[in-house]
């Protein structure tokens, strides 16, 4: 009874909408087929079976299909004994007392094997997709972590080496910078010392130049002072009374022309190169003026003309010797000028009586020489 009640319970929810559905319900039909194939159910009359199936919620079409599929539509119970009142027998539930012929068992075993294979396959896939990655993933993670730790240790070692190298390079660079700074300071000191020495040398050179300039100026002054005074005669002079006097020849045109211009008293014997404006010296002592007497003054006194000429020649020679050290070109010009002056003076002397005033001779000679000439 309990099994029949359990079979009725799952079929009750589907019995209510059974009459309304037009399409046959295959699960109910299959259950009815199994129910009809039961040996005990076959012994029951057909009407009882139909009534029981209708009670379970199957329609007439479904019941007919179930009878056709089960092959029990023509089964009728055979009468064994006398007619006895028919007692309705409650059919047992299919699951509680299944009909187990040989074919159905193998089908059940096959279905069970398929179900077990599906479950095993599901477990295998679950294990492969989820459990195995978790297990292997942990191992891979461990290996990856180990590899990462090894790489980190290598990196830390390389970083430490690079840091030490950088520190050594920085120390060497700092040392080089310090050396360069020392060299720069030394160069700066050397430059300062060189500047100081150059400045002192320049000051000393300027002082030496100033000293040389002062010495040159003093030498110039000495030379100029030397030229301001007439030189003393070195050669002895002939007395005036021993010098023969020649009368001027009337045929010389220079004497005639000079007699006409004998009233000109000053005559300069200096050359243009020895002029006071050119040399930059004072005209005192560097110029020589001569006063020649005309025909009116010839009778006033007798003068030694040759002595005067000798004095003039000596003075010109001394001047020429002084000027030879300075400029050679000026010497040549002075020679020409001196010869011209001497020629002119000789021509002037030819026109007179050969005597010049004694006072002019005293001015051109030193005191000792004038006294000697007077004694003679």
Curated annotation (Swiss-Prot):
One of its GO terms (molecular function) is signaling receptor binding. GO terms for cellular component: fibrillar center; peroxisomal importomer complex; peroxisomal membrane; peroxisome; protein-containing complex. Residues 359-376 have a biased composition (Basic and acidic residues). Residues 1-19 have a biased composition (Polar residues). Residues 1-23, 70-93, 230-376 are annotated as: Disordered. The modification Phosphoserine is found at residues 232, 282, 334. The modification N-acetylalanine is found at residue 2. The modification N6-acetyllysine is found at residue 34. GO terms for biological process: cellular response to reactive oxygen species; microtubule anchoring; negative regulation of DNA-templated transcription; peroxisome organization; peroxisome transport along microtubule; protein import into peroxisome matrix; protein import into peroxisome matrix, docking; protein import into peroxisome matrix, substrate release. Residues 319-341 have a biased composition (Acidic residues). Keywords: Acetylation, Membrane, Peroxisome, Phosphoprotein, Protein transport, Translocation, Transmembrane, Transmembrane helix, Transport. It is found in: Peroxisome membrane. Residues 127-376 are cytoplasmic. This is Peroxisomal membrane protein PEX14. It comes from Rattus norvegicus. The gene is Pex14.
